[in-house]
Amino acid sequence: MSKVTYIIKASNDVLNEKTATILITIAKKDFITAAEVREVHPDLGNAVVNSNIGVLIKKGLVEKSGDGLIITGEAQDIISNAATLYAQENAPELLKKRATRKAREITSDMEEDKDLMLKLLDKNGFVLKKVEIYRSNYLAILEKRTNGIRNFEINNNGNMRIFGYKMMEHHIQKFTDIGMSCKIAKNGNVYLDIKRSAENIEAVITVASEL
């Protein structure tokens, strides 16, 4: 069976061939744009691609982030289950190899930092759409993009991150002034990072609330 077939099977037939195909494309590249997805699938046609992206969003498997698209934790579970199904049927030795790999853990200090972040976000009037774990990172996703900010994150690599889109330069400057590093992608996505500590988390959220 093809990769698409295993994705469909792992989804318990929630997905069909087109939605599964597009989900795989989005999973391969974080923040891929709808235009880029259409370029990958000219055979499907723009209207079909757009429609199926909409279906994936409604099913909670894909989310918009600025102009980009990312898969959700639920979609990642489907993909992981599909890989397991493939291994069971075609290469059981892969399961042994995978069993030796340890997923990055959600550590106790991450939990503490996440709780502090959520407390401060609430205190400063930020309204959250949801909090989720994505690739062993805590994401506090705002209900509406605020001053370009989409997410506040507690990351497994020891950093706190702000993920934004087309943030104003003088707003970015306020964050870099407190020691955050900044990366700006060509598509307008902004990544602001700083080492996690209670002091830094409070400073970041204070600056964000004063923009």
Curated annotation (Swiss-Prot):
Pfam families cross-referenced by the UniProt entry: MotA_activ, MotCF
Alphabetized UniProt keyword annotations: Activator, DNA-binding, Transcription, Transcription regulation
Effect of residue 140 to D: Temperature-sensitive
DNA-binding region range list: 23-42
Top-level taxon: Viruses
UniProt xrefs under Gene3D superfamilies: Transcription regulator MotA, C-terminal domain (3.90.1150.20), Winged helix-like DNA-binding domain superfamily/Winged helix DNA-binding domain (1.10.10.10)
InterPro entries: MotA_Tscrpt_reg_C, MotA_Tscrpt_reg_C_sf, Phage_T4_MotA_Tscrpt_reg_N, WH-like_DNA-bd_sf, WH_DNA-bd_sf
Record keyword Transcription present: yes
Alphabetical list of SUPFAM superfamilies matching this protein: DNA-binding C-terminal domain of the transcription factor MotA (SSF69652), Winged helix' DNA-binding domain (SSF46785)
Gene Ontology molecular-function annotations: DNA binding
UniProt miscellaneous comment: MotA synthesis starts immediately after infection and stops abruptly some 4-5 minutes later.
Its job: Required for the transcriptional activation of middle promoters. Middle promoters are characterized by the presence of the conserved sequence [AT]3TGCTTNA (MotA box). MotA binds directly to MotA boxes.
Protein name: Middle transcription regulatory protein motA
Organism per entry: Enterobacteria phage T4 (Bacteriophage T4)
Biological classification of the source: Viruses, Duplodnaviria, Heunggongvirae, Uroviricota, Caudoviricetes
Gene responsible for this protein: motA
